[in-house]
Every structure is written in C-alpha cells, then in structure tokens.
From Swiss-Prot:
It catalyses: 1-(5-phospho-beta-D-ribosyl)-ATP + diphosphate = 5-phospho-alpha-D-ribose 1-diphosphate + ATP. The keyword Aminoacyl-tRNA synthetase does not apply. Catalyzes the condensation of ATP and 5-phosphoribose 1-diphosphate to form N'-(5'-phosphoribosyl)-ATP (PR-ATP). Has a crucial role in the pathway because the rate of histidine biosynthesis seems to be controlled primarily by regulation of HisG enzymatic activity. Belongs to the ATP phosphoribosyltransferase family. Short subfamily. The gene is hisG. Pfam families: HisG (PF01634). Its EC number is 2.4.2.17. GO terms for cellular component: cytoplasm. This is ATP phosphoribosyltransferase.
Amino acid sequence: MTKPLVFAIPKGRILKEALPMLEAAGIIPEPAFLDKESRLLRFKTNRPDIEIIRVRAFDVATFVAHGAAQMGIVGSDVIEEFSYPELYAPVDLDIGHCRLSIAEPKRLAKDDDPREWSHVRVATKYPHLTHRHFEARGVQAECIKLNGAMEIAPALGLAGRIVDLVSSGRTLEENGLVEVEKIMPISARLIVNRAAFKMRAGDIAPLVENFRRLVGVADNVA
C-alpha cells in the first residue's frame, strides 16, 4: 500500500492565508489542526492519501528537501536562504507578501548612504542570503545569526544593522529603526521534493495543477 503524501505547512504568518487555499485545492485538515491548544504536529485530512505536518517555516524546506515530506508551502525567503537543489518550487501562491530589507537606527540613517558601504555588521535570520546580497555589491558583510528579536540588536550594540522581513514597517518604527534598502520581495511558494515528484508524479502532478489553477497559472507542470 502506498504511503500517504506528507504536506508540510508553516506555523506563523503564512498559515492563515494558506488554509483557505489548501481547502480550495481539496485538502481539508482534521479539526485538531485548527485547535490552538493542540500540541500535535501531524494531522489527517479529508483525503486518506494526504497527511499534513505543521512545523516552523525554516523546517518546512528541510523536511521537503530530505524527502520526509513530499510537498509544502513556504516563503521564498526560506527557499533562497537554503538553496536546496532537491526543492522544486512550481507555483508562486501569491500569498504571504512582504519584503526582505535592510534596516538601521533612524539616527544613523539621516547621514548614511548605502551606496558608500564597504563593510557592514548585520544581525539576521538569513546569513547566507545576506552574504550573497552584499557580496554581489562588493560589500564585506559580517553576519550574526539570530532566530528572532532582530530589532533590538542595534540598540544593544550587537550589530549596526539588521536584515529581516518587513510588512507594514510598524515593528521597525516602534524600535527606532528605518528601512534603508530592499533586498527582495517575498511571497509563499508551493514546493515539491524533486525525487518524489518523479516517483509519484501521478499523485503529485494533479495537486500542483490544482494550485496552479487557483492562482491563474495555465502552464502545464514541467
């Protein structure tokens, strides 16, 4: 008997927007998935051939890349940070929109010109993506990896600048920071394990097409 497909969903900002899309694609999680008090991480769906796991966004990419999950939804920031060759991202889901940006204290930004940077010390959850961005600009970057609370790093002298996701900019403003450069726009993507796609194309390709139709992409699955 073929094992159910495992579909990885991220906790946090994307989850709320992803749920209606999942349901529209014909995948409805069991009621326990919506229970905020539940500590379960693995859930059944209305389809016996599909299960859902709910994990941290960065872990979605890892589970899918290593084949523990065959499909998932995750932000393009995570895809770019890890650059797993095992991941195929066939559909931009047009949800979870924000941007990855560089921010610094307002007092510094008054007289600062990013075009003149030669060396920066940055606190970020995205060290690889950040290094690549600055390397392309010819700027030497010292990246300090944090998993959260980036906004407080400049005030405590840990780093002069931060690289983080920005939506409304309110969190930056409340912490005395200002956005000075946008690195890239971010949106959520459907991801698939490449090996699983080849081995279980009959199961996975129709799901990919369902998501394509939902966002109005008419191209056939490559």
